[in-house]
């Protein structure tokens, strides 16, 4: 167990947590089951200055290890934007990452950095879905910067999807065009396995 963490240059005592907790029963106990798909949601930082989420990441990594290696389940993770989970190796047992980017230089650079960090933790397949595509020039921008083998497809910019998000609705139910594009991306994922 670890009960000490560093804060700046000072040490402080914190609630201890196990590095290898038994989590085999948690997915079945805690998951929401929707049409045969189980959903687990990890919390987030609720208040500024509340400290790191190290215990939560230890728990998440243990749950993922259990699901991937012991159960041989299919796991899809929607990780928060950023690189911290790569530094922690939270998703190191995944077969591949799918990075959602937009047609901009910083977004492409984020993909490049994710690909580098993923390789460091043993994940060699990093695929791309290009989102908020307005026209052919956006598609060409993406194609000129992303290797063809990594590019899964495009999702068009859609006011309908934005309106659905503002209303708290699923774009899945509101935008048949986006749904068709997502189905094409799924077919591309299946074809590249």
Regions found by a protein language model. Give the residues of each.
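Single conserved hydrophobic/aromatic residue that forms the stacking wall/gate
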Residues: 2-7, 12-13
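Conserved catalytic network of the ASCE P-loop NTPase/AAA+ motor domain
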Residues: 4, 31-32, 66-70, 90-92, ...
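Alpha-helix-centered segments that form part of catalytic cores
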Residues: 14-42
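Conserved beta-strand segments of the P-loop GTPase G domain that flank and frequently precede/overlap
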Residues: 41-42, 99-102, 128-131
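Switch II (G3) loop of P-loop NTPases
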Residues: 42-48, 52-53, 64-86
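Conserved nucleotide-binding/hydrolysis micro-motifs of P-loop NTPases
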Residues: 45-47, 81-82, 104-106, 133-136, ...
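Inter-motif core of Ras-like GTPase G domains
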Residues: 62-71, 86-105
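C-terminal lobe/tail of nucleotide-utilizing enzymes
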Residues: 119-193
């Amino acid at each position: 167990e670890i009960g000490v963490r560093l804060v700046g240059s000072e040490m402080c005592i914190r609630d201890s947590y196990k590095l290898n907790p038994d989590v085999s029963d948690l997915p079945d106990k805690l998951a929401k089951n929707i049409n045969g798909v189980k959903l687990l949601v990890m919390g987030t930082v609720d208040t500024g200055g509340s400290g790191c989420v190290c215990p939560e990441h230890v728990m998440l990594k243990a749950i993922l290890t259990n699901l991937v290696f012991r159960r041989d389940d299919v796991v899809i993770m929607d990780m928060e934007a950023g690189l911290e989970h790569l530094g922690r190796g939270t998703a190191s047992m995944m077969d591949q990452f799918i990075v959602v980017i937009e047609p901009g230089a910083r977004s492409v650079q984020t993909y490049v950095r994710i690909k580098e960090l993923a390789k460091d933790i043993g994940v060699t397949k990093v695929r791309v879905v290009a989102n908020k595509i307005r026209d052919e020039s956006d598609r060409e921008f993406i194609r000129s910067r992303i290797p063809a083998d990594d590019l899964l497809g495009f999702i068009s910019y859609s006011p309908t999807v934005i309106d659905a998000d503002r209303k708290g609705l699923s774009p899945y139910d509101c935008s048949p065009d986006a749904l068709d594009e997502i189905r094409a991306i799924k077919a591309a994922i299946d074809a590249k396995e």
